[in-house]
């Protein structure tokens, strides 16, 4: 949305102003602007609207809905970030003109509709990119990873393709999605829905007992998904707490066995394993009903390992063919941040293995981070409940020592996965690089249109890396807003206490970030600590009282009181109700703002 200059467009909230109404910027500081009466239309006080500035007044362009409705708030957030949910009319027309399934008469498309194929997705998912089939062959497991054949429905250069390239990826916010592809494709013709024949590109692999992947083959196929399984449902089956749907128990158990083999092989070659979680929301028509933090479960791991194996197999094939494509690159960590990570974790009492003296090379840095991750995981387990509360904060330190992954046309590698060649093949419904990978793969197999050239791959890699970063920022912001809406409601209904046990998760000069309750986060300004002048620790892992030496460190327990919730901005301000004892093992002084 336009930010500067006369006549700019922005998202605002309708507020009362004397005898009239005004529009106050919803997501940024700014003075209220008197609404032009002729443009007010159906807008009411409390509504979120898009407006165009007209001097000191504003003209309503569209009404998004009241701030009490999560759907309206999410629509406003997307509009504020210039993310379109609806596709241009030319894209919609092109999608609606597709009569139905296109691959029925394709020469060479294999009929695998007799296989047992399953999808495993989050509850509520509608765009099903991938499905799995599996069979035992002696000691080996033959794995088929079926991915939606989006390239069959989206020819290069068409209206759908141009818009998908511009968007780069889908953007997911609580309760809705801004899809890369029009819904006619993303949730219908390309989605691997149960009970419907769908066109796919299949990666067939043999998983050996030691996790080695051999005999990789790629081809176009047609499948019939037997069942739409969910992560919680598969977790219950794997835990023995539930039965798989009839005829699917072997598929689930064999897929889990394949995942265990693949995971063990990845860990043996030095892959990095980091535990983290993201909030998952239940959204009602008029409120955020609930939120839970979803961590990595056996069902998540099952799907992830199979997808990684397929991505690596396609990458190896494209490298061997020296064919242009878009790779996923995760650079080895730099030495200085890793050395600092070791200092931070040791200061916080985490037992770590010895690290080499002097500068670390890329390989040494990667091995050191992997060793730190293993030690940190063991330390968190050893701390029991205290470790569980501090886990996200400690893992956050490790993640901040790593470089960010991005797309590139160059064959390099993926440090975190310890993979010599890696790309994204498994999500062409929601990621444009995956669609380019499909086109290049099918071209090399001689069963598709010409694939992208090197220039197209380079341009798409740069653009998609940028849109991915933007999407991550928007999604995190939307999560904060949804959590603030939930917290505001629970406090208003007195369904949650205003005082909560929390854990320090981050520190800046201005104060502390604190996780509290089961899913909430807030900021505790340093001015509210009281009783002393607090200065940042030299390693940026806590605050230290200048007079008392009192330390409040990352991972420490702290009881907090909610002071203010600014839901639209996703801000929660806290104050200390009581400070728990610091768990850090050493005592050092530091200076606020100085190092």
Predicted features along the sequence, with ranges:
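Terminal, basic amphipathic appendages of nucleotide-handling enzymes
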Residues: 1-130, 170-172, 226-235, 584-595
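Short, surface-exposed loop motifs enriched in S/T, G, D/E and P with embedded aromatic residues
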Residues: 12-14, 502, 560
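Electropositive polyanion-binding surfaces
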Residues: 90-534, 540, 555, 565-572, ...
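Short amphipathic alpha-helical linker/capping segments at the junctions of internal repeats
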Residues: 578-582
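Short nucleic-acid-contacting surface segments enriched for D/E, G, S/T with interspersed K/R
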Residues: 37-51, 493-499, 534-560
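Intrinsically disordered, low-complexity regions enriched in proline, serine, glycine
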Residues: 72, 571-574
């Amino acid at each position: 949305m336009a930010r500067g200059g006369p006549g700019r467009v922005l998202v605002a909230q309708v507020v009362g102003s004397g005898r009239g109404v005004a529009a106050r910027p919803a997501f940024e500081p700014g003075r209220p602007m008197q609404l032009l009466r002729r443009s007010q239309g159906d807008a009411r006080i409390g509504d979120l609207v898009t407006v165009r500035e007209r001097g000191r007044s504003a003209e309503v362009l569209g009404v998004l809905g009241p701030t009490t409705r999560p759907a309206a708030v999410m629509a406003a957030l997307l509009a504020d970030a210039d993310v379109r949910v609806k596709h241009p009319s030319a894209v919609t027309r092109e999608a609606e003109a597709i009569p139905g399934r296109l691959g029925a008469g394709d020469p060479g498309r294999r009929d695998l509709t007799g296989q047992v194929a399953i999808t495993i997705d989050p509850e509520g998912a509608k765009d099903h990119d991938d499905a799995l089939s599996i069979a035992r062959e002696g000691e080996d497991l033959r794995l088929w990873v079926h991915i939606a054949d989006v390239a069959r429905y989206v020819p290069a250069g068409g209206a759908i393709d141009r818009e998908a390239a511009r968007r780069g990826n889908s953007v997911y916010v609580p309760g809705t999605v801004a899809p890369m592809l029009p819904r006619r494709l993303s949730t219908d013709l390309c989605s691997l829905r149960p009970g419907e024949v769908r066109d796919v590109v299949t990666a067939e692999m043999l998983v050996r007992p030691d996790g080695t992947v051999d005999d990789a083959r790629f081809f176009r196929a047609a499948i019939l998904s037997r069942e739409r399984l969910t992560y919680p449902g598969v977790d219950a089956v794997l835990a023995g707490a539930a039965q798989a749907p009839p005829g699917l128990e072997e598929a689930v158990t064999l897929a889990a066995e394949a995942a265990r083999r693949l995971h063990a092989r990845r860990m043996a070659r030095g892959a990095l394993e980091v535990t983290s979680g993201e909030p998952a929301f239940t959204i009602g028509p008029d409120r955020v009903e609930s939120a839970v933090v979803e961590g990595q479960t056996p069902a998540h791991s099952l799907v992830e390992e199979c997808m990684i194996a397929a991505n690596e197999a396609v990458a190896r094939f494209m490298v061997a063919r020296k064919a242009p494509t878009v790779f996923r690159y995760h650079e080895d960590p730099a030495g200085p941040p890793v050395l600092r990570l070791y200092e931070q974790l040791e200061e916080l009492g985490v037992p770590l293995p010895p690290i080499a003296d002097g500068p670390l090379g890329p390989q040494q840095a990667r091995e050191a981070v992997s060793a730190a991750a293993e030690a940190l995981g063991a330390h968190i387990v050893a701390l029991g409940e205290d470790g569980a509360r501090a886990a996200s904060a400690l893992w956050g330190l490790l993640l901040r020592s790593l470089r960010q992954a991005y797309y590139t046309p160059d064959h390099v590698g993926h440090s975190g996965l310890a993979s010599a060649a890696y790309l994204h093949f498994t999500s062409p419904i929601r990621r444009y690089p995956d669609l380019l990978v499909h086109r290049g793969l099918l071209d090399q197999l001689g069963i598709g249109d010409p694939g992208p050239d090197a220039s197209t791959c380079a341009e798409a890699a740069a653009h998609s890396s940028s849109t991915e970063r933007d999407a991550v920022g928007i999604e995190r912001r939307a999560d904060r807003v949804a959590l603030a809406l939930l917290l505001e409601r629970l406090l208003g209904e007195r369904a949650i206490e205003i005082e909560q046990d929390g854990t320090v998760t981050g520190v800046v000069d201005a104060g502390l970030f604190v996780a509290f309750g089961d899913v909430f986060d807030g900021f505790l300004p340093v001015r509210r600590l009281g009783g002393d002048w607090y200065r940042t620790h030299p390693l940026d892992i806590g605050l230290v009282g200048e007079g008392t030496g009192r330390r409040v460190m990352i991972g420490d327990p702290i009881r907090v009181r909610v002071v203010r919730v600014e839901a639209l901005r996703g801000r929660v301000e806290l104050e200390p109700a009581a400070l728990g004892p610091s768990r850090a093992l050493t005592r050092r002084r530091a200076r606020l703002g100085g190092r």
